[in-house]
């Protein structure tokens, strides 16, 4: 079975968020999450984001999604 996973470029994601002046809470709210830990776990690579979340993050940060996330195919 082929599985696609998103690999997070944690350093670039954190840098872009900080440059825009957003907190973890701001990012989580934008994603519709109740806890700021939701975004923190994505940013630190502890949790793989859903495709929709990755797209929302890149939209808010006004950067191409490929700056922060790469798709890796596993077989």
Question: Where are these predicted regions, by residue range?
Answer:
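Short, basic-rich loop-to-helix N-cap that marks the start of a DNA-contacting helix
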Residues: 21, 45-58, 74
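The alpha-helix within a helix-turn-helix
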Residues: 17, 28-29, 58
């Amino acid at each position: 079975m082929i599985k696609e996973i998103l690999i997070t470029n944690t350093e670039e994601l954190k840098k872009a968020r900080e440059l825009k002046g957003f907190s973890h809470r701001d990012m989580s709210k934008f994603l519709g999450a109740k806890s700021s830990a939701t975004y923190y776990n994505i940013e630190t690579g502890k949790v793989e984001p859903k495709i929709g979340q990755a797209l929302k993050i890149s939209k808010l940060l006004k950067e191409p999604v490929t700056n922060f996330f790469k798709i890796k195919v596993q077989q």
